[in-house]
Amino acid sequence: MTDIQIAVQEQPFDQNAVYQWLSEQHSIGATVIFVGKVRDLNLGDEVSSLYLEHYPAMTEKALNEIVAQAKVRWDIQRVSVIHRVGLLQTGDEIVLVGVSSAHRGDAYHANEFIMDFLKSKAPFWKKEQTNQGERWIEARESDKEALEKW
């Protein structure tokens, strides 16, 4: 069984199943899971839905490279990255990043690192449906700044 699970999918993910997989080894003392959701407000406008596109194969390659970098920097045992694509509604879960390790510090830092790099380096494109119409979402300056701490 591999220690990395990466999926780009349209269907919802099962947080409980991911947690069970991440934490099933007895050497694991910490499991950190981040779940991102579609917000109902962005840039001052009400958001009703979000459409996510990706570049198949290239996206998975980028996610694998990000996870590989995290595994070099921290002593982590298992990683799960699931990112949804397609049409999502307000409140839907978009992304899950889960990391397990013997110690919480490694799990926390690796999880944040993976999420920060996923936001800026993985080829996903987001189009929001708002009360003002449709718009493509540009990368935020705060996402770029988050990379600088690493």
Swiss-Prot record:
- In which residues is substrate bound? 37-39, 103-104, 119, 126-128
Report the protein name in the record.
Molybdopterin synthase catalytic subunit
Subunit: Heterotetramer of 2 MoaD subunits and 2 MoaE subunits. Also stable as homodimer. The enzyme changes between these two forms during catalysis.
Coiled-coil regions listed: none
Biological process (GO) annotations held by this record are:
Mo-molybdopterin cofactor biosynthetic process
Pathway(s) it belongs to: Cofactor biosynthesis; molybdopterin biosynthesis
Q: Name one GO cellular component term.
A: cytosol
As one GO molecular function, the record gives:
molybdopterin synthase activity
This enzyme catalyses: 2 [molybdopterin-synthase sulfur-carrier protein]-C-terminal-Gly-aminoethanethioate + cyclic pyranopterin phosphate + H2O = molybdopterin + 2 [molybdopterin-synthase sulfur-carrier protein]-C-terminal Gly-Gly + 2 H(+)
- Return the InterPro entries for the record: MoaE_sf (IPR036563), Mopterin_biosynth_MoaE (IPR003448)
Q: Answer yes or no on keyword Manganese.
A: no
Task of the protein: Converts molybdopterin precursor Z into molybdopterin. This requires the incorporation of two sulfur atoms into precursor Z to generate a dithiolene group. The sulfur is provided by MoaD.
Which family does the UniProt entry place this protein in? Belongs to the MoaE family.
Query: What keywords tag this UniProt record?
Result: Molybdenum cofactor biosynthesis, Transferase
Report the EC number(s), separated by commas if there are several: 2.8.1.12
